[in-house]
């Protein structure tokens, strides 16, 4: 498999799930550092949804309409560690400013 890089938006298989976890085959944004992705056999990612979100930042971040075919939101609270075997093709990547906002959001949620 090609290198998985921080900031990439890739397809991922999030099944099986429990409770309110995001599931199915859907886009995710990779938030873990490249060296972690390369050495661990896993990545840390946030789920993306095309369903309009009522919750704003820091729980969700709306992506620019040009990034994916449908208007989409990153669900910052839906952070998952995934085996690289669950990760598929690259769809696009988020801008560095968007990555900063995602990390800022998770820090607000966990108290960083």
Walk through the language-model features, giving the residues of each:
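Conserved functional hotspots at enzyme active or ligand-binding sites that engage polyanionic ligands
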Residues: 1-112
């Amino acid at each position: 498999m090609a290198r998985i890089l921080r900031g990439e938006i890739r397809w991922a298989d999030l099944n099986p799930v429990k409770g309110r976890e995001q599931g199915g085959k859907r886009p995710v944004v990779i938030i873990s550092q490249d060296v972690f992705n390369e050495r661990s056999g896993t990545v840390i990612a946030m789920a993306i949804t095309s369903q309009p979100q009522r919750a704003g930042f820091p729980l969700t971040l709306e992506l620019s309409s040009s990034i994916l075919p449908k208007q989409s939101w990153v669900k910052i609270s839906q952070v998952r560690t995934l085996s690289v075997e669950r990760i598929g093709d690259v769809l696009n990547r988020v801008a560095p400013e968007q990555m900063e906002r995602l990390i800022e959001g998770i820090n607000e949620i966990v108290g960083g």
